[in-house]
């Protein structure tokens, strides 16, 4: 069948266009791809595959240049044909929400996959596996989904005149944005508007999802990330308004924060993270908040879990803990609230509903540096940075490692080294590879070697999280943790 005809047939069946629109749609496609595609045939069946073939034909016809950016821009323009306009998407969402919030969310999720905003084909390239640990099973992913720019595009991006539009990748102005070499194409992007604590916010999915239904809740205004009482109010409002989803925030300080600190936002989704399954290892009640169940969970980072029927009680207690942590120091365990007025303490908060109750996990963070640990005292230390050196953000805090693409080949290379097929590994992996070889000197089976290396990556990720934990998993560390809890105020009843 002719490629353009087949694509247009799919567009008509997947959108509000009708058969009468066929000629119009064909001309829309030809204007973007080139009339030389008219005779091209296809044996593909899926809409996104047909779109990809049209993009490659546009490159062949020299309608667009042979670059990742040009491909992305054309691809999103073609998929915009199956995407209703923003007002219609919002109208459909809220009409469905009135009958079933779950159905409204599901419909928007399906649209975001159907129109290739969520890059399912790219996400499928990621490597993902689980590893056992003292803290339960952890999740390891090697992130291969994001396409890497080639050197020509990187050079071109440096020459592009600076633009403040959109101000960042999370601004509402991204909806329908054409794209350029240093800003992603978002023609097929749609955002659900909703009111939260008296302000307009947006709800969208993450194009390169790290977990099931990975979504972003973003401030309608371009305002910097800030953890405050409002953060707890908003997170609990989200889990109430979007049933089945958790919601969490990155911390708001360098080193312990996420990659985007310039635009206030939260992340969420329908995924049970390892941290959610972590049991309480110590329980108590805070004075004045006796109705709130509280405790420290068994986790490599320092986490207080609060559970209650009352959102108001949770918000008030979380804010009290946060305010106390911001000014709390304990020199006996290298915890310092500030240096010369520069704050070191913040929180990574996560909210969910469980068994009808609201739950908040408060992860204590400290971004101090030292001569011994210039990248951060509570950051992956030098000896584990060959696996993970980036900030430990919200997703990793919860037990899902997001590791760089280089590790795919490097893990295989270390496995080859263990069985004698390779004589060298990357310099920064040499010590690790030699250590594994000394532990397994007689390995000959490549598959077994690969399993050993992958398990070792998991064990190193545990160390990464332990490095980021402010109170260590030692008698001294846990006693210090309880001193902070007592400072907040424990109920003696």
From Swiss-Prot:
Gene of this entry: galT
Keywords from the UniProt entry: Carbohydrate metabolism, Cytoplasm, Galactose metabolism, Nucleotidyltransferase, Transferase
Protein name: Galactose-1-phosphate uridylyltransferase
Subcellular location: Cytoplasm
Pathway as given in its UniProt record: Carbohydrate metabolism; galactose metabolism
Keyword hit for Transferase: yes
Gene Ontology biological process terms, A to Z: galactose metabolic process
Homology family: Belongs to the galactose-1-phosphate uridylyltransferase type 2 family.
One GO molecular-function entry: UDP-glucose:hexose-1-phosphate uridylyltransferase activity
Main location group: cytoplasm
Keyword Nuclease in record: no
GO cellular component, one term: cytoplasm
Protein origin, superkingdom: Bacteria
């Amino acid at each position: 069948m002719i490629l353009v005809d087949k694509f247009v047939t799919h567009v008509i069946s997947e959108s509000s266009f009708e058969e009468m629109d066929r000629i119009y749609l064909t001309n829309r496609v030809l204007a973007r791809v080139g009339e030389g595609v008219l005779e091209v045939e296809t044996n593909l069946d899926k809409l996104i595959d047909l779109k990809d073939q049209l993009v490659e034909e546009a490159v062949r016809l020299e309608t667009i240049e042979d670059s990742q950016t040009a491909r992305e821009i054309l691809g999103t323009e073609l998929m915009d044909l199956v995407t209703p306009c923003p007002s219609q998407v919002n109208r459909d969402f809220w009409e469905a929400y009135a009958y079933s919030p779950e159905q409204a969310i599901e419909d928007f999720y399906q649209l975001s996959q159907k129109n290739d905003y969520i890059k399912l084909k790219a996400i499928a390239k990621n490597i993902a596996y689980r590893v056992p640990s003292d803290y339960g099973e952890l999740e390891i992913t090697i992130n291969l989904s994001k396409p890497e720019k080639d050197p020509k595009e990187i050079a071109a991006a440096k020459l592009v005149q600076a633009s403040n539009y959109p101000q960042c990748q999370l601004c509402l102005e991204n909806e329908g944005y054409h794209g350029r070499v240093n800003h992603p194409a978002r023609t097929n992007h749609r955002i659900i508007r909703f009111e939260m604590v008296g302000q307009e916010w947006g709800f969208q999915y993450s194009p390169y999802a790290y977990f099931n239904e990975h979504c972003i809740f973003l401030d309608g205004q371009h305002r910097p990330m800030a953890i405050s009482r409002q953060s707890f109010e908003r997170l609990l409002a989200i889990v109430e308004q979007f049933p089945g989803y958790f919601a969490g925030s990155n911390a708001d300080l360098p080193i312990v924060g996420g990659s985007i600190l310039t635009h206030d936002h939260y992340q969420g989704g329908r995924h049970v993270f390892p941290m959610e399954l972590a049991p309480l290892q110590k329980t108590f009640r805070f004075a004045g908040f006796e109705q709130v169940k509280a405790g420290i969970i068994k986790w490599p980072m320092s986490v207080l879990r609060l559970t209650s029927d009352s959102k108001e009680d949770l918000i008030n207690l979380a804010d009290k803990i946060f305010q106390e942590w911001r000014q709390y120091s304990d020199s006996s365990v290298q915890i310092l609230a500030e240096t010369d007025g520069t704050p070191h303490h913040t929180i990574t908060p996560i909210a969910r509903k469980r068994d009808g109750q609201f739950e908040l996990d408060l992860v204590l963070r400290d971004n101090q540096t030292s001569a011994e640990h210039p990248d951060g005292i509570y950051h992956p230390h030098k000896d584990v940075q060959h696996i993970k050196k980036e900030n430990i953000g919200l997703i990793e805090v919860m037990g899902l490692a997001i590791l760089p693409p280089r590790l795919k080949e490097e893990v295989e290379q270390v496995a080859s080294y263990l069985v004698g097929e390779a004589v060298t590994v990357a310099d920064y992996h040499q010590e690790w590879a030699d250590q594994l070889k000394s532990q397994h000197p007689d390995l000959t089976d490549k598959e077994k070697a690969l399993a050993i290396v992958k398990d070792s990556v998991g064990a190193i990720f545990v160390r990464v999280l332990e490095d980021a934990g402010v109170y260590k998993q030692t008698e001294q560390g846990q006693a210090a943790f309880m001193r902070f809890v007592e400072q907040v105020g424990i109920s003696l009843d």
